[in-house]
Amino acid sequence: MLHAYDGGVPFHLYLKEQFKEHKNWGSKDRKRYRACCYFFWRNAIGVSRNNAEDILQWLQSHYTSDTSISETPSITHPYHSVIHNISTSIDHQTLQDWFKEEPPVWLRATNGKTKAVLQQLQKLNTPILHQSNDVVAVPAQANLNPITDFGYAYIQDIGSQMAMDWRELPLQHMCNPNHAIWDCCCGAGGKAITLLQNHPKANVTCSDVRANILENLQKRFQLLQLSKPKTQVIDLQNTVGSSNQYDVVMADVPCSGSGTWRRNPENIHFFSPLEINMYANRQLNIIQNAQHSVKLGGYLVYMTCSVFRAENEAIIEQFIEKHAGFEKIEDKYCGGNQNHGDYIYRAVLQRVR
């Protein structure tokens, strides 16, 4: 499986298809094969996958079914090919430790359904790894369909939830019906959902370049019993935002995803450093088009799930250099190793003139 995989789809989906094809593999076999594969992705950095023999030899030397006593290589940093691109705010050893651990899945209960979520987890014999109010972390392989399919909770990493915690920011006062917020790269709507969980009366518009994504977004909001946002299909790569329309513009831009790679560790084996500049150019273009829509005194919130400076701090520096009317209020990395989550970069800018 490791030799044949080409990176075309997420490995967990590829693995699922392999298990379907090999119905003779029992549950213990599937669990063992999965653990072995992900041990390889997390630790075999730089190991050739040109032939199956190289992979097998490496696994025989380093892996046992008890990963607690497996000899984990520590010479090669998982991000070694892009190490000089990592933000100076992120410690390299901390990032390595973070990458080698399988992350939990984070759930957030909706509309006061925390008790129902906890009862369902108990019924499913699912251990709770972390809990804070309506946010719960469970093991990665937990079956959460009985919870998420009925809208009791939604899945969102704690890093993203922390990035949407605006309680200490001045823009929290704009999360009401009298102010307009635009989630201009909304994707499946996760950030907008959390915004409305935190501020139920917020006036939100969501846009994306993909119409089908917006249709799915509306279904998610309906399932979670949240007020549906206004939606628009907009390609901000090629379209300038309308002038002075929004008090807050939220840009969770497409990125390398390097701050989430421990969830999909295979990605690091297929990533080219040349992609960083490609993403950075796209990101700068998007926020330069979106900034036209920020009212005077309003805010631009820039977010990525990347650990690379070129996609984060450098973008903000370039943007402010070109657009002197904006000032940086703050920038930070949310989540990360300390919080058992993804690394989410968030910068808050204000249009002051």
Regions found by a protein language model. Name each.
Residues M1-R353:
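S-adenosylmethionine
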